[in-house]
Each structure stands twice: as structure tokens, then as C-alpha cells.
Curated annotation (Swiss-Prot):
It holds the Pfam family Sof1. Pathway: Protein modification; protein ubiquitination. Residues 411-434 are annotated as: Disordered. Keywords: Nucleus, Repeat, Ribonucleoprotein, Ribosome biogenesis, rRNA processing, Ubl conjugation pathway, WD repeat. InterPro entries: Sof1, WD40/YVTN_repeat-like_dom_sf, WD40_repeat_CS, WD40_repeat_dom_sf, WD40_rpt, WD_repeat_DCAF13/WDSOF1. Part of the small subunit (SSU) processome, composed of more than 70 proteins and the RNA chaperone small nucleolar RNA (snoRNA) U3. Component of the DCX(DCAF13) E3 ubiquitin ligase complex, at least composed of CUL4 (CUL4A or CUL4B), DDB1, DCAF13 and RBX1. It comes from Danio rerio (Zebrafish). The keyword Ubl conjugation does not apply. PROSITE patterns: WD_REPEATS_1 (PS00678), WD_REPEATS_2 (PS50082), WD_REPEATS_REGION (PS50294). It is found in: Nucleus, Nucleolus. WD repeats lie at residues 64-104, 107-146, 154-191, 194-234, 236-276, 280-319, 323-362. This is DDB1- and CUL4-associated factor 13. The gene is dcaf13.
Length: 445
């Protein structure tokens, strides 16, 4: 007699320990799940709501400065170290995990205009209103030993910015001219000038370190190649740019922070038109810094807010503000791309999360899986009206909201005026300019 017996492998359904979750057999045939999309939509909506509920971006405030913070820089090798300079000439070294100041140096008389770390992380450079460049050891001196700079260079004019080469012992400063310096020499190796009174900012390209760019007082952005004896080209804009930052992943893109409340991303291969115009601030943009991934950047503005922009989008995905925070002077993105540091008028350095709702600390495997699943669901249903409305909603200070409405009315009035002028003029006499073309005056080779 033949008997048919069901035979199952216990490994397919039995838990290894009592703490494991129960194994549930699933059939992924879509015909068996007709309500799969409505269920996913509900989950996406709930995930979006929870994301806004848990959006607590503020992490810590580092206080200790006695004057306005003028500049911040990151340590080249250490994630936990940040160096800041103030308007009273004081430089402080901070330990971020402990949230405390580990060292204080009276570096300059007057403003500290710029700080940069050496590429190996053994020392850092500062420039100030006292016309000096000073190199300081990254390690604090022993107990009772007086704090002295490793090297001091006396310049002929005030320096307004400094940046270090990514691989070699050279650095660049800006003031009345853009100067390339060797660490072993007390005079510049190379100087660039192009009929400009002064420069406000200069940055090396992190990918192509022979390229650098500067912002000038005549509303221009000038590009240089250290292998050449003269500047390459410059683009003149409607208003002055305060500072700029290169994309760390794509060598030919840089973003500049402008006085006209916007940021502009340029491709150095075609400077006639910016690649993207980033609009959301309601006052002058003072600083900008890219994420190490090169996909986003953060901007600091005179309107007392910080905004995070995707590199290819015209509007910000996030805005940070507090009641106590005043005009934001400088901003930096941490090297692990998880945190943002900002320095403002009321003498505080604030630490923010790059993703406002991200949970800090070690996550379990199930937490990671759930977070990734929710992220994909939100991405899948991001254009649905309810999901989009909740994801975009932000609370703004009353002043910022009022200025935003005023700017919107002004832009609409300007657009109507241009339409009326074009309507009552000879066809073709009034050119139709796009938003990107309006802000560039000319490119000089």
C-alpha cells in the first residue's frame, strides 16, 4: 500500500532562537494582492507624516566666543575637530563629540578673515586685519608653554581669505591681489590681478588643485590656473558674489553666494549662463559649502536662516532657523555628510543634522530596513498631492514669510511690466530673457 506524506524542512519555518521573529511564507504574485498600491500609498503618507513629526534638526550649541564668529573650517583628517575664528581676533579649536572648546588662541588684532587646515592636518593657517598670515600647530603646547605661531608672514595689505592646496605645501590668499604662497618662503610665488580693487574669497578646486576661483568687488568671479601666469577668464554678474564653493565630486561645477538673494551654479566650460539658479533666501547669501557627496550644498544668509539645496534644483529642500539665531555668517558641512555647522552674529556655533528626521546612534538591522523601506515609499509617491503637501510644509519666522510674500509680489510686477513693454514695442526689439540669462552681464576672456 502506497501512502503519500507531506514532508517539510523545519529550517524553512522554525526559528533558531525564541528571540527571532516568526518566519511568514509569502507569495509575491501581484494577482493575489489587488490592494497592494493603496496599502503602499497609506504607508507612504504615514511615513511622510512621521518624518515631519520627528524632524528635530538642532543638535547642539557651542558657546565661548566673545564676538561675532567670522569663519569656520574643518580639520583635514579628523571628523571631531573644528576651528573657528571671531571678529576679536580669537581662534578656538572645538571637540564636537564632547561639545567643548579644547584650545583658545589670540591669533590677530582685529577680525580673523580666514582659516584653513593644512592637507595633512598637522597645522592650520589664519589671516586677519593686521596684514599677517600665521601658521599654528594643530597640537596644543604643553602646560605653562606660551602659545606661539610656527611661522608669521607680514603682508603689504589686508588679507580677506585663504585656502590650502589639497596635496602640496602651497596656499593661496586674497586681498588686493590673489597670491600663491610656498610655506617655506615669506613672499608670494605668484600674484594675479585683473584691474580689480579687492577680492573677498578664494577657493582651490579639490579635484583639479591647479584650478582656483575668486570673488571680486567688481561683481566678477575670476578663474585661475596656477600653471599659467595670467587669469583664465571672468564672469561679471549683476550684483556682487560674497563667496563660492567647488563641487567636490564634479571638478567643473562651482556654486557662488550672491548679494541678490540667490545662489548660482556654474559650469566652467560655459560661463555665459549658469546651470541652475537657486532661489529661496530673502536676503543676501553670505556663505555656501558642499556636502562631501557633491549632491547637495548648504547656504547661510543674512535673513537668519540656513537652507539645504539639491545641486540641480532651484528651491531648497530644508530650512533651519531658531529664535535666538541672528544673521548667519559662515557655514560648513561635516566630512561625514551627516552634520552642518553654522556660525552667527550672536557668538554661537550651532550643530545641525543634515537630515532633520534622521535617528542618531547605532541602528538595528530592522530599524535600517524600515527606514530604507519608508524612504523608497516616499520617493515612489512623492508627486501625489497629499504626500507632496506634507513633505514640503515648513514653518518660517514671521519676518521671513513677510519678505517672501513681498518678493513674490515684486517679481510678479516685474514680469507684468516686461510683458506690457514687449506687447507695446516693435516685434523683436525687446528680447525675451530667461531667468538664468538675466543675471550675467558678460564673460571676459
Amino acid at each position: 500500500m502506497k501512502v503519500k506524506v507531506l514532508c517539510r524542512n523545519p529550517d524553512d519555518y522554525v526559528r533558531e532562537t525564541t528571540r527571532d521573529i516568526q518566519r511568514v511564507p509569502r507569495n509575491y504574485d501581484p494577482t493575489l494582492h489587488p490592494f497592494e498600491v493603496p496599502r503602499e500609498y497609506t504607508r507612504a503618507l504615514n511615513a511622510t507624516k512621521l518624518e515631519r513629526v520627528f524632524a528635530k534638526p538642532f543638535v547642539a550649541s557651542l558657546d565661548g566666543h566673545r564676538d561675532v564668529i567670522s569663519c569656520i573650517t574643518k580639520h583635514a583628517k579628523s571628523l571631531s575637530t573644528v576651528i573657528s575664528g571671531a571678529c576679536d581676533g580669537e581662534v578656538k579649536v572645538w571637540n564636537l563629540p564632547k561639545r567643548e572648546c579644547t584650545r583658545t588662541v589670540q591669533a590677530h588684532e582685529g577680525f580673523v578673515r580666514g582659516i584653513c587646515s593644512r592637507f595633512c592636518g598637522t597645522s592650520f593657517f589664519t589671516v586677519g586685519d593686521d596684514k599677517t598670515i600665521k601658521q599654528w600647530n594643530m597640537e596644543a603646547p604643553g602646560y605653562g608653554v606660551r602659545e606661539e605661531p610656527i611661522n608669521t608672514i607680514l603682508g603689504k595689505a589686508v588679507f580677506t581669505g585663504i585656502d590650502h592646496h589639497q596635496r602640496e605645501g602651497t596656499f593661496v590668499t586674497c586681498g588686493q591681489t590673489v597670491d600663491i604662497w610656498d610655506e617655506q618662503r615669506s613672499s608670494p610665488v605668484l600674484s594675479f590681478s585683473w584691474g580689480v580693487d579687492s577680492f573677498s574669497s578664494v577657493r582651490y578646486n579639490p579635484v583639479e588643485p591647479d584650478l582656483l576661483a575668486s570673488c571680486a568687488s567688481d561683481r566678477s568671479i575670476v578663474l585661475y590656473d596656477t600653471r599659467e601666469s595670467a587669469p583664465l577668464r571672468k564672469v561679471i554678474m549683476q550684483l556682487r558674489s560674497n563667496t563660492l564653493c567647488w563641487n567636490p565630486m564634479e571638478a567643473y561645477y562651482f556654486t557662488c553666494a550672491n548679494e541678490d538673494y540667490n545662489l548660482y551654479t556654474y559650469d566652467i566650460r560655459n560661463l555665459d549662463v549658469p546651470v541652475t539658479v537657486h532661489m529661496d533666501h530673502v536676503s543676501a547669501v553670505l556663505d555656501v559649502d558642499y556636502s562631501p557627496t557633491g549632491r547637495e550644498f548648504v547656504s547661510a544668509s543674512f535673513d537668519k536662516t540656513i537652507r539645504i539645496f539639491p545641486k540641480d534644483k532651484g528651491h531648497s529642500r530644508e530650512v533651519y532657523h531658531t529664535k535666538r539665531m541672528q544673521h548667519v555668517i559662515c557655514v560648513k558641512w561635516s566630512a561625514d555628510s551627516k552634520f552642518i555647522m553654522s556660525g552667527s552674529d550672536e557668538m554661537n556655533i550651532r550643530l545641525w543634522k543634515a537630515n532633520a528626521s534622521e535617528k542618531l546612534g547605532v541602528l538595528s538591522t530592522r530599524e535600517k530596513t524600515a527606514a530604507n523601506y519608508n524612504k523608497k515609499l516616499i520617493q515612489k509617491f512623492q508627486h501625489h498631492p497629499q504626500v507632496r503637501r506634507i513633505a514640503r510644509h515648513r514653518h518660517l519666522p514671521r519676518d521671513v514669510l513677510k519678505q517672501k510674500r513681498e518678493l513674490k509680489e515684486m517679481k510678479e510686477a516685474r514680469r507684468r511690466k516686461e510683458q506690457n513693454v514687449r506687447k507695446h514695442s516693435k516685434p523683436g526689439s525687446v528680447p525675451l530673457l530667461t531667468e538664468k540669462e538675466k543675471h550675467v552681464v558678460k564673460v571676459v576672456e
